[in-house]
Amino acid sequence: MQGNAYNGDCSTLTEVKARMIREDIDVFCLQESGNFFGSISAECWNRIFPEYEFYVARNMQIGTSSRGILVNVYYVAYGKENLRCSMAIIVKSELDTGKAAITYINPNLRPVIGVLLNDNTAVYNIHAPSGNHNFAASVTYCFLQEIQDFKLKYNIDNYVLIGDFNCPPDVMKKNVTYANKTHYADEATQNSGACLDYCIASISPQNMYINKNAAFSDHRQVVMDF
């Protein structure tokens, strides 16, 4: 789901972590994540790839030491001037292999970032460009081709591409070869009434629901159980 891109005090990460405990969420994908650097000590961040502003902070404590959990926070940073392009994946440390991916199809577009879980499932976070549904679908198709290449190259069993596609599922199905693997709840995920947040995956969710309280932005939290 989307965060508050103009959230300079970094409270978005605090709320995400609280929800992970409250709702027992394993992986949380966030678009427009804002500025995460202010909420985690600078020495905790490690840059994953030298050529990208892609960082990870590992084994961050959520909750109390006796009842809390440890999470790894993956974050693509674009500085304080372009927070709408920042993205994050927060994953329970015990489920994370520590292997991550980032891919661009165009330097002027937001990337897709991904993590590999210990059941050999890769989870990718997407924030497709807005304004034109067909263009958003074509960008998604290009990313899915990259994901298929990753799957074959690294012998990954399954993938889940989830996030804000900026394209309704019916348009996506007309434009994307892999759209038969599109999974969505048949209701609005944005306050405008549009369904833009869902997943395209090689496995099917057993359950999904929409949190109608858009606490972070005008997009609602989409929860899927695999």
Map each language-model feature to its residues:
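N-terminal, active-site-proximal structural segment of metallo-dependent hydrolase catalytic domains
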Residues: M1-N72, R84, Y141-C142, V160, ...
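Active-site-proximal beta-strand/loop segments in catalytic clefts of secreted hydrolases
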Residues: M1-N4, L30-G34, N59, V73-E81, ...
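Active-site-proximal segments of metal-dependent phosphoesterases and phosphodiesterases across multiple
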Residues: Y124-Q145, P169-M172
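Surface-exposed cleft-lining segments at the edges of enzyme active sites
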Residues: G3-A5, K99-I105, H127-S138
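Conserved beta strand-loop-helix elements of the APE1-like EEP
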Residues: I62-I69, E81-G98, S192-Q206, F226
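Metal-dependent phosphoester-hydrolase catalytic domains
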Residues: A101, D149-V160, F165-F226
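Alpha-helical scaffolding within the catalytic cores
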Residues: T14-E15, A101-I113, A185-D186
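Beta-strand-turn-beta hairpins that frame and shape the catalytic cleft
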Residues: M87-G98, P107-A128, F226
